[in-house]
């Protein structure tokens, strides 16, 4: 159950980062303030909830194991950036993502 909490904390953290990115996207000048307030408000909510879940994780998992698992954030953000904003990702970046996933598998198998 705690591993599910860790994944959910990671996803909420990523959602917060993506909301921050969305807040920076261009909108018409007359809608800009509402746009920024909405997306930054959502970012704060996601990041706040992620922090509370993260504290639960830290109570149950050694920090040396839990913290590296947050590198999943790099994977989620890359996938979301490609899907949502059609951002280009170089082969070198994909190689880095693969190494991150490999590292998480290695760390996860030691628990």
Swiss-Prot record:
Role: Translocates 4-amino-4-deoxy-L-arabinose-phosphoundecaprenol (alpha-L-Ara4N-phosphoundecaprenol) from the cytoplasmic to the periplasmic side of the inner membrane.
S-S bonds: none
Keywords: Cell inner membrane, Cell membrane, Lipid A biosynthesis, Lipid biosynthesis, Lipid metabolism, Lipopolysaccharide biosynthesis, Membrane, Transmembrane, Transmembrane helix, Transport
Family the UniProt entry places it in: Belongs to the ArnE family.
GO cellular component: plasma membrane
Assembly and binders: Heterodimer of ArnE and ArnF.
Domain EamA: 40-109
Superkingdom, taxonomy of origin: Bacteria
InterPro entries: EamA_dom (IPR000620), Flippase_ArnE (IPR022883), Small_drug/metabolite_transptr (IPR000390)
Keyword DNA repair: no
Stated name of the protein: Probable 4-amino-4-deoxy-L-arabinose-phosphoundecaprenol flippase subunit ArnE
Compartments, record wording: Cell inner membrane
Alphabetized Pfam families for the sequence: EamA
Record flagged with keyword Transcription: no
Gene Ontology molecular function: any one: carbohydrate derivative transmembrane transporter activity
Biological pathway: Bacterial outer membrane biogenesis; lipopolysaccharide biosynthesis
Transmembrane segments annotated in the record for this chain: 36-56, 61-81, 88-108
GO biological processes: lipid A biosynthetic process; lipopolysaccharide biosynthetic process
Topology in membrane: Multi-pass membrane protein
């Amino acid at each position: 159950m705690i591993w599910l909490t860790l994944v959910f904390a990671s996803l909420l953290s990523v959602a917060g980062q993506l909301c921050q990115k969305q807040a920076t996207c261009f909108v018409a000048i007359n809608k800009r303030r509402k746009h920024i307030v909405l997306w930054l408000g959502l970012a704060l909510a996601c990041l706040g909830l992620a922090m509370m879940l993260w504290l639960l994780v830290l109570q149950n998992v050694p920090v040396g194991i839990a913290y590296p698992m947050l590198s999943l954030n790099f994977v989620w953000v890359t996938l979301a950036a490609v899907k949502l904003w059609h951002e280009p990702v170089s082969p070198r970046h994909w190689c880095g993502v693969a190494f991150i996933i490999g590292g998480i598998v290695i760390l996860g198998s030691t628990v």
